[in-house]
Amino acid sequence: MTDSAEYPLPNVSHDLTGQVALVTGATSGLGHRFARVLAAAGAKVIGTGRRRERLDALVSDIADEGGVAVGVEMDMTDTASIVGGLDHAEAAFGLVTILVNNAGVPDAQRAHRMDTELIDRVLDTNLRGPFVLSVEHAKRLIAAERPGRQVNISSISATQYDGHGAALYSVTKAGISRMTEALAVEWARRHINVNAIAPGAFHSEMMDGMLERMGDFSAHTPRGRLGSPAQLDSTLLYLCSPASDAVTGTIIKVDDGQSPR
């Protein structure tokens, strides 16, 4: 029988007091929401992005809500910027214990129409950058002999593609899902939990921009709607909190029934 003193009944808590969380792509959309949610749960938050004025606005929003945050400029296509951003995060709040790899860019083009500059930007931002950051984050946790959590934002497009554009986006999200599974195996003995959320179509600055270019398909979804970012809060908190201690290498699909099974 499990000792109830070790595990409360029920063993569920979203309290992140004492944790330090870094959220990439926090200047808009889902990342902005994720940063605010983690701060509201008690974590000290580092929001990263390339737009300083947006970062300042995020920090102000979190402060108004009673949280603590700093904004750090980080370019996910630049290794030096990634490593330097993590250095700045640690200088502000200490060792980062929670990483949310959220930053990403769409392509919204058919593959044969993409120039190599766009291909490189999408690959670097959506896949190479998150891998570099995940590895750098894990190195620091391992050196400090501390456990940690990484939550990668994948997509239902990792496993399905309708051929109407955004092929490379689909490829990068498939890479994020596989990265999640592989790194979870590699770092399990180090007590670093690596999981992913695979959202369907949720309202965000990026998604709304894609809808403008590709057309609004929400009426054709089973529930005739796009999701609200707030509907991802509970999944994010579960994967960032002690409630998911035994969960690693898992990709949780949150799609409002939008994808086939």
Enumerate the predicted regions with their spans.
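Conserved glycine-rich cofactor-binding loop
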Residues: 20, 27-28
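Active-site helix of classical SDR
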Residues: 134, 172, 180
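Substrate-binding pocket helix/loop in short-chain dehydrogenase/reductase
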Residues: 110-111, 115-123, 217
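C-terminal substrate-recognition "lid" of short-chain dehydrogenase/reductases
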Residues: 93-94, 131, 225-254, 259
